[in-house]
């Protein structure tokens, strides 16, 4: 499971 969620 790969989660890419930038905190911008």
Swiss-Prot record:
Keyword Transmembrane: no
GO CC field: extracellular region
Molecular function per GO: hormone activity
Any single biological process term in GO: neuropeptide signaling pathway
UniProt keyword annotations, A-Z: Amidation, Hormone, Neuropeptide, Pyrrolidone carboxylic acid, Secreted
InterPro entries in the record: Adipokinetic_hormone_CS
Keyword Nucleus: no
Domain of life assignment: Eukaryota
UniProt subcellular location: Secreted
Residue numbers of Pyrrolidone carboxylic acid PTMs: 1
Modified residues (Tryptophan amide): 8
Cross-referenced PROSITE patterns: AKH
Function in brief: Hypertrehalosaemic factors are neuropeptides that elevate the level of trehalose in the hemolymph (trehalose is the major carbohydrate in the hemolymph of insects).
Similarity comment: family membership: Belongs to the AKH/HRTH/RPCH family.
Stated name of the protein: Hypertrehalosaemic factor 1
């Amino acid at each position: 499971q790969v989660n890419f969620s930038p905190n911008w």
